[in-house]
Swiss-Prot record:
It comes from the Eukaryota. This is Peptidyl-prolyl cis-trans isomerase ppi1. Keywords: Isomerase, Rotamase. One of its GO terms (biological process) is mRNA splicing, via spliceosome. Transmembrane segments: none annotated. The lineage of its organism: Eukaryota, Fungi, Dikarya, Ascomycota, Taphrinomycotina. PPIases accelerate the folding of proteins. It catalyzes the cis-trans isomerization of proline imidic peptide bonds in oligopeptides. Belongs to the cyclophilin-type PPIase family. PPIL1 subfamily.
Amino acid sequence: MANVELQTSLGKILIELYTEHAPKTCQNFYTLAKEGYYDGVIFHRVIPDFVIQGGDPTGTGRGGTSIYGDKFDDEIHSDLHHTGAGILSMANAGPNTNSSQFFITLAPTPWLDGKHTIFGRVVSGLSVCKRMGLIRTDSSDRPIEPLKIIKAVAL
């Protein structure tokens, strides 16, 4: 377990997982990808110069489960920071509420440090992420045209 490739409607994004820093989170993401959980799932939230967020099979931003059941605990480390574009973190609704939703940063987002588990980074396909960040959205930051994960491949 080391990488996951997201084959999206705009191109491929290769993600390196930080298995030493966030083993439980990485196992969750990797297993969900391997089992096809993310296949066909949309990026339901896109905010330019901030994040692209996906991983909710309901497409609402309120759904998703983990391989551990409903939610699982954060794995936050003081040596990992949201320093720039391409950081992979868990989306959550507060402390220890991780499930299947994740986001990829499009810029430095230091105010997220200590609040979201960082568990990987984009090693190829950052231009795809940046293009996603330019997609037209509605007033709820939802893309007008769906951005899909066609297939998530555990490598």
